Regions:
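Short Lys/Arg-enriched helix C-cap and helix-to-coil transition segments
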Residues: 56-71
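Key DNA-contact positions within bacterial/archaeal DNA-binding proteins
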Residues: 32, 43
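Positively charged, aromatic-accented nucleic-acid-binding surfaces
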Residues: 1-31, 37, 69-130
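Alpha-helical DNA-recognition elements
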Residues: 51-55
Length: 130
């Protein structure tokens, strides 16, 4: 992931606050960020990701990218795209997972019934920056 072409948006909901990387028309999260999002241990998120790949639901080279070196890590960090975030969200068993599934289902329902879905907060933010 190229840092210079990477937009970061702030996601905040139900006490969860994340800086989300937005690039190539998708969002990218680390396992640590997914752990916070879904309220589960990083090891649980890792296990779900492994199973998604093992079961052939998604392809690793299409859903994961390595990005940067931090002062705390010897190697780049793995980032996973929205396809993986959704797959993990439908597998994880937690209160945050339930909220995520309800949100994802409502967005899908809007697309199916209305033909579109609107992220009102994002739209308002973009209007302020123009």
């Amino acid at each position: 992931m190229d840092e210079k072409k990477n937009e970061i948006i702030l996601f905040e909901n139900q006490g969860v606050k994340l800086e989300v990387n937005l690039k190539d028309e998708t969002v990218w999260l680390t396992q640590e960020q997914m752990s916070k999002l879904f309220g589960k241990a990083k090891s649980t998120i890792n296990e779900h990701i492994k199973n998604v790949y093992k079961e052939g639901e998604l392809i690793e080279k299409e859903t994961m990218t390595k990005f940067g070196n931090s002062e705390f890590a010897d190697k780049p960090t793995n980032y996973y795209n929205l396809d993986m975030i959704i797959s993990v969200g439908y597998r994880v068993k937690s209160q945050n997972g339930i909220l995520f599934r309800k949100w994802a289902t409502s967005v899908l329902k809007d697309y199916m019934l209305k033909g579109y879905a609107i992220n009102q907060k994002r739209l308002e933010y973009l209007e302020k920056t123009i």
